[in-house]
């Protein structure tokens, strides 16, 4: 399933299915993307707004950072599913001979590393959203304060 082009309904249905992907990593990445999108929305709705002239540069920077994180998080949602599938492929490798066992073990170890790196990246960009949300909630358009807080 291409998580980036599926509908929200299909994405959620796929998550609820008997299939192992999308799983927790993809959901965490999607949550990060929506948080960044909310911060970005606050910035976009603060631009050129009367009373917010002194934070225009900060909102521009917020918008750029949030857009970057949003796009990165979306790519990580798909990456999480991809690395999990590669891990499952490694587990399915033959293990009849000593050579096959060594190759399988090496593939599994590499797949573990790859599979661990994606959630680590998701966590790192999710942490960055706290700063964006703080700026959005405290300096952005106050009609959108709840969106900034939820981000």
Each language-model region and where it sits:
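Short, hydrophobic/aliphatic alpha-helical segments
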Residues: 3-22, 138-141
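Amphipathic, well-ordered alpha-helical segments in soluble domains
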Residues: 7, 11, 34-41, 76, ...
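Conserved phosphate/anionic-ligand binding catalytic regions in large, soluble enzymes, centered on
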Residues: 17-40, 144-151
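Alpha-helical scaffold segments that form or flank carboxylate-/histidine-based iron centers
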Residues: 20, 61-69, 115, 147-151
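Transmembrane signal-anchor/signal-peptide helices with a preference for the extracytoplasmic
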Residues: 41-53
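A structural-propensity feature for long, helix-poor, extended segments
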Residues: 50-89
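Amphipathic alpha-helical interface segments
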Residues: 80, 84-151
